[in-house]
Curated annotation (Swiss-Prot):
Family statement drawn from the similarity comment of this UniProt entry: Belongs to the ABC transporter superfamily. Ycf16 family.
NCBIfam families: sufC
One Pfam short name: ABC_tran
Protein residues bound to ATP: 38-45
Keywords, in A-Z order: ATP-binding, Chloroplast, Nucleotide-binding, Plastid, Transport
The organism of origin for this protein: Pyropia yezoensis
Domain ABC transporter, chain residue ranges per copy: 6-250
A GO molecular-function descriptor: ATP hydrolysis activity
InterPro entries xref list: AAA+_ATPase (IPR003593), ABC_transporter-like_ATP-bd (IPR003439), ABC_transporter-like_CS (IPR017871), FeS-cluster_ATPase_SufC (IPR010230), P-loop_NTPase (IPR027417)
Name of this chain's protein: Probable ATP-dependent transporter ycf16
Length: 251
């Protein structure tokens, strides 16, 4: 049986005085792809940010285990270095910082954490030129400032490039399909499928079943009112497409 990478135990979390997560339980093993679906306000994005350690959210109770160790007291940057990757729904722009510099710094921070030697600029360039084909981008993309002036599709492909480069143990993709046309969606999905391996795991957070036409998850979880209320296969997402989220509360 494959190793458990992430385990969430009876997790409660809040923003200010508002409790958002109300007893979330989830276990993810190496090699698995999990899709989390649900209506607006159900807690999907909150869950992703709490796993990553976003400071805006307060933990009330419960635990998050990464390879069997609690990460509640670990800072967000240390979680990232350890192998937890979060692709945001709305990637931020970083004026004045080139993609190449940003990616090399991020990669070397992770390598240093792992006790590995840092890549020189030349070594990094050789690696990144291999990875960039994965997301269908030109080399000129590397000299542009991070996400500055990028289209929605370019921003999402940039995050998949980061995911490919960092080789994280668990990647959480928050509404990666949001705002993508069908061609961009196919490119992004191809990259994600290529990166799915027996040694890592992926969480896809999405509103819509269309992403799951291109990336077939092992499990689909439905969130409602801060809890996972139903789990099934990809056919669960297809049922949602037909009947809507109200169907879940009625079954």
């Amino acid at each position: 049986m494959s190793q458990t990478i992430l385990e969430i135990k009876d997790l409660y979390a809040s923003v200010g005085e508002t409790t958002i997560l109300k007893g979330v339980n989830l276990s993810i093993r190496a090699g698995e792809i999990h899709a989390i679906m649900g209506p607006n306000g159900s807690g999907k994005s909150t869950l992703s940010k709490v796993i990553a350690g976003h400071p805006a959210y307060s933990l009330i109770s419960g635990d998050i285990l990464f390879f069997g160790q609690s990460i509640l007291e670990i800072e967000p940057d240390e979680r990232a270095k350890a192998g937890i990757f979060l692709a945001f729904q709305y990637p931020v722009e970083i004026p004045g910082v080139s993609n190449s510099d940003f990616l090399r710094i991020a990669l070397n921070a992770r390598r240093k954490f792992q006790g590995l030697s840092e890549f020189s600029p030349l070594e990094f360039f050789q690696l990144i030129t291999e990875k960039i084909d994965l997301v269908g981008m030109q080399e000129s993309f590397l000299t542009r400032n991070v996400n500055e002036g990028f289209s929605g599709g370019e921003k999402k492909r940039n995050e998949i490039l980061q995911m490919a480069l960092l080789d994280s143990k668990i990647s959480i993709l928050d509404e990666t399909d949001s705002g993508l046309d069908i061609d961009a969606l196919r490119v992004v999905a191809k990259g994600i499928n290529t990166l799915a391996k027996s040694t890592n795991s992926i969480i896809l957070i999405t509103h819509y079943q269309r992403l799951l036409d291109y990336i077939i998850p092992d499990f689909v979880h439905i969130m409602s009112n801060g809890q996972i209320v139903k789990t099934g296969s990809v056919t669960l997402a297809q049922d949602l497409e037909k009947h809507g989220y109200d169907w879940i509360t009625q079954t």
